[in-house]
């Protein structure tokens, strides 16, 4: 939902906000969809089989409304708390995905807010999401986040443990 990064590194916050707020979201979305169509054609894939997700991290609701009006139907949010407010004021139906790290104690909220959790990285979280989804009679899709780099600062199940986690789930 942001601009293509035209801001200079030395620009102040006010300048960055102005650049991002002046960006034509509909035009950006159209340009991205065109790039998807070209790439899909190059490899013989149906461009309609590609899903475009707009990430709402730090984006204010009026800008999200612009994206929804421009045809975006899939939104990704990093934070459960931020999603609560944004989903409540969304101007059109959309499929919301949690793309950020999820603490087990926030699973109870995530189950009701999101269609999919992209960051499951441990059995305890998967089990709690499953338990909460069953209580809510809600189907919840999950994706396993794998830390393939092995960096301690990155989230995700270590690559060597990923298969065991998937099998257990």
Q: What is the predicted role of each segment?
A:
Residues 1-20:
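N-terminal amphipathic/basic-hydrophobic helices that include classical n-h-c signal peptides
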Residues 20-169:
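Conserved alpha/beta-domain cores
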């Amino acid at each position: 939902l942001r601009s293509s990064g035209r801001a200079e590194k030395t620009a102040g916050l006010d300048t960055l906000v102005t650049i991002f707020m002046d960006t034509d979201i509909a035009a950006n979305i159209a340009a991205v969809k065109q790039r998807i169509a070209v790439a899909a054609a190059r490899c013989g894939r149906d461009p309609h089989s590609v899903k475009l997700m707009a990430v709402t991290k730090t984006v204010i609701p009026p800008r999200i409304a612009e994206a929804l009006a421009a045809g975006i139907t899939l939104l990704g949010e990093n934070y459960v708390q931020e999603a609560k407010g944004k989903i409540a004021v969304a101007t059109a139906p959309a499929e919301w995905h949690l793309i950020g790290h999820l603490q087990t104690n926030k699973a109870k909220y995530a189950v009701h807010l999101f269609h999919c959790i992209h960051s499951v990285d441990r059995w305890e979280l998967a089990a709690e999401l499953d338990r909460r989804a069953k209580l809510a009679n809600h189907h919840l899709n999950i994706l396993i986040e794998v830390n393939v780099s092995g960096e301690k600062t990155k989230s995700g199940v270590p690559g060597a443990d990923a298969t065991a986690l998937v099998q257990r789930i």
